[in-house]
Amino acid sequence: MQAATAYPVARYMDFFDYVPASEIPGVLNRSSILLQLANTFASDGPKGFMTTKLFESMAVGKPLLCVKSDESCLEATIRNTHSGLAARTAEEAFRFILHHYQFWQDNGYTHINTDKEAVERFSRKKQAVQFMRIFTRLNSK
């Protein structure tokens, strides 16, 4: 909140206290653009941090903006699922926001055409099936 008040953007933002997990899909569906905060790590630093927030965001079909791109797994997943943009520059983020803002002005909502099959691979149901296959295979050894 402090960072938002340092710039003239606070009036465009909603801040939530604790939100129960059961309410998260509703919050995401009421949002216009979903924000995923990340960063580019040093070449010897950690890579591939993908939180459940990412997968929940991809599932609702709203534009997903990741700032700053991790230039790794997160960026590749967003690109491969067509769920938004992992911005490497402020200009990229600006163009993404402007595009979806103009769509919102014209239509009253935002949407992005994700690759639903690619997103579905990350669902809890699909992951549970994958784990069951692994455990079944291990059990047969």
Segments from the language model and where they lie:
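Short hydrophobic beta-strand element within catalytic cores of glycosyltransferases
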Residues: 33-36, 56-68
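Hydrophobic "lid"/C-terminal helical patch
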Residues: 4, 97-101, 131, 135
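Acidic donor-binding loop of glycosyltransferase active sites
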Residues: 28-47
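A charged, aromatic-enriched C-terminal amphipathic alpha-helix characteristic of glycosyltransferases
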Residues: 88-91, 105, 109-138
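Short acidic active-site motifs
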Residues: 22-23, 53, 92, 96
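Short alpha-helical segment that forms part of, or immediately flanks, the ligand-binding pocket
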Residues: 25, 47-60, 75-76
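Nucleotide-activated donor-binding/catalytic signature segment of Leloir-type glycosyltransferases, i.e.
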Residues: 1-25
